[in-house]
């Protein structure tokens, strides 16, 4: 009633009726909305803004862009701001990349061996053939089984192979190398008896009398003279060492060396 009186005083009758209808409709709408909201139950979901990482990143990115626009920064400053924003996204995606890398490492690696040389198959190779080849090649057989295999003579095959070395002749050191792996072909034309009798060269002992040309009685005289000189030399050395400081400033060692040099010159 009060609203209608105010409207009547404000304008004409037609205008008052039109405004009254608009106000009435607005009041009816508000009452209807209130009644409708009072009769409904609002269900709140577990999804919220702080729990969503993507929404947080978008919000941070928007804040950074707005702050850059307000401050009017340059290109370099914008790059720094963008790098700070993207670092948060990189940290969030780091966990996902770690999981992917772990899965990639756990996968079985496939190697390509096509470039390597191929080896012949050993499906057709037998142990008997290998043992026979090793036996006749000159080496001690290593592929025989340890289990006893009796032959016609009642001896094992392993003992027979070990006794083959007893019948083998001792190899001359001139024919082969020290390890026996290399044979010298220049000895093929030399008879075996000659090779057996060969001995290493030992230089003969040369007598000092023959070097000086002394023979017969002169040789004996030469020996006596040498012994006399040696005896005289040792007597002289002994007398020098027994002087006990009576020789003045002379050094006994120098005197002995001089006598030794003189003896060598005489011989």
Curated annotation (Swiss-Prot):
One of its GO terms (cellular component) is mitochondrion. Keywords: Mitochondrion, Transit peptide. Residues 1-44 form a transit peptide. It comes from Candida glabrata (strain ATCC 2001 / BCRC 20586 / JCM 3761 / NBRC 0622 / NRRL Y-65 / CBS 138). It comes from the Eukaryota. Required for respiratory growth, stability of the mitochondrial genome and for proper assembly or maintenance of mitochondrial proteins. Residues 243-267 are annotated as: Disordered. This is Protein PET20, mitochondrial. Pfam families: Pet20 (PF08692). The lineage of its organism: Eukaryota, Fungi, Dikarya, Ascomycota, Saccharomycotina. Residues 246-267 have a biased composition (Basic residues). The keyword DNA-binding does not apply. InterPro entries: Pet20-like. It is found in: Mitochondrion. One of its GO terms (biological process) is aerobic respiration.
């Amino acid at each position: 009633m009060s609203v209608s009186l105010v409207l009547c005083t404000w304008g004409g009758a037609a205008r008052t009726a039109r405004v009254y209808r608009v106000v009435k409709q607005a009041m009816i709408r508000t009452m209807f909305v209130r009644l409708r909201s009072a009769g409904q139950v609002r269900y709140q979901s577990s999804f919220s803004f702080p729990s969503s990482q993507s929404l947080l990143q978008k919000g941070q990115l928007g804040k950074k862009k707005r702050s850059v626009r307000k401050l009017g920064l340059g290109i370099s400053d914008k790059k720094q701001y963008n790098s700070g924003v993207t670092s948060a996204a990189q940290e969030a995606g780091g966990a996902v990349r770690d999981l992917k890398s772990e899965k990639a490492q756990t996968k079985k690696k496939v190697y390509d061996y096509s470039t390597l040389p191929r080896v012949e198959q050993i499906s057709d190779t037998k142990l008997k053939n290998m043992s026979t080849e090793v036996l006749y090649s000159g080496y001690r057989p290593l592929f025989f089984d340890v289990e006893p295999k009796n032959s016609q003579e009642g001896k094992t095959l392993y003992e027979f192979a070990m006794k083959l070395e007893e019948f083998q002749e001792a190899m001359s050191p001139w024919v082969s190398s020290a390890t026996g792996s290399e044979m010298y072909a220049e000895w093929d034309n030399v008879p075996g008896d000659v090779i057996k009798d060969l001995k290493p060269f030992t230089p003969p002992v040369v007598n000092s009398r023959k070097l000086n040309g002394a023979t017969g009685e002169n040789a004996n005289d030469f020996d006596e003279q040498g012994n006399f000189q040696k005896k005289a030399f040792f007597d002289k050395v002994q007398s020098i060492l027994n002087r006990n400081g009576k020789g003045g400033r002379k050094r006994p060692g120098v005197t002995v060396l001089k006598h030794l040099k003189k003896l060598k010159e005489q011989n």
